[in-house]
Amino acid sequence: MDRKYKDTSSEEEDSLNEDEMAWIPWYCNLKGNEFFATIDEDYINDDFNLTGLSSLVQFYDSALGIILDSDPDDPLSEDQQEALERSADILYGLIHARYILTPKGLAHMHEKFKKAEFGRCPRVFCQNQPVLPVGLADMQGVDTVKVYCPRCNDIFNPKYRRHSHIDGAYFGTTFPHLLLITYPELIPTKPPQQYIPKIYGFKIHKSARERQLQIQQKKNSLSNNNQNNQNNNINNNNNNNNNNNNNNNNNNNNQQNNNNQQNNNTNK
């Protein structure tokens, strides 16, 4: 099996013989795939766990064969190989979304969370709180994976761009919340601190900010009205010019008709 379509992420991987390494651990160790758990082959071999996926993945059987290290029956062209590898990516991601909701999958992700392998919250007052991957939808192709902070209860883009290609459906909308229910000791007990805007040491009153917002909205409204009036004036001027041109054309036509009439009278 050709495995050159992605680079490995560590010197240790470079030292391993890829021909002797199973596809699943090899795939999960690729740079950019650190969020993925290593799915047990027993889980994948159970057809019940894959129900409904065959209609979602092109070349399903061949892609499943790649994941389970089954050699293809016939030699593949480079284009065929790339298409199958892409299908294997998608299939593994869809299986992964189901696996991490199982007790064994949750336990695996629990260990990764404790090691902060998914990153930490970028918010200052969350004090480097580890985050969890989450999808904004359970349907593939809607959005990329985000990270959820259990301290501030907000979501962010992953820190590293190499994770920006991962589909959010490969983790789903349920996973982080199910993990925290399963392992309640992971829920931060300290409430998140909120930033308080101040000017010269004094807290900005909410009404002052609302007043500034109202003023800005009025300015925007006046600006839009002025722009609309200008556009209307331009349109009116254009219409007047068109009317003047039409009148001039009519006058010219009338003059031409008069000239023609005079010529006819002269000829008679």
Curated annotation (Swiss-Prot):
Q: Name one GO cellular component term.
A: cytoplasm
Q: Where is the composition biased (Low complexity)?
A: 224-268
Disordered as annotated region, ranges: 222-268
One GO MF term attached to the UniProt entry: protein kinase regulator activity
Which InterPro entries does the UniProt entry name for this protein? Casein_kin_II_reg-sub_N (IPR016149), Casein_kinase_II_beta-like (IPR035991), Casein_kinase_II_reg-sub (IPR000704)
Instruction: Give the superkingdom in one word.
Output: Eukaryota
Xref: SUPFAM superfamilies: Casein kinase II beta subunit
What SMART domains is this protein classified in?
CK_II_beta (SM01085)
Write out the function statement from the record: Regulatory subunit of casein kinase II/CK2. As part of the kinase complex regulates the basal catalytic activity of the alpha subunit a constitutively active serine/threonine-protein kinase that phosphorylates a large number of substrates containing acidic residues C-terminal to the phosphorylated serine or threonine.
Q: How does it assemble?
A: Casein kinase II/CK2 is a tetramer composed of two alpha subunit and two beta subunits.
Q: Which family is this sequence assigned to?
A: Belongs to the casein kinase 2 subunit beta family.
- What name is this protein filed under? Casein kinase II subunit beta
Species of the source: Dictyostelium discoideum
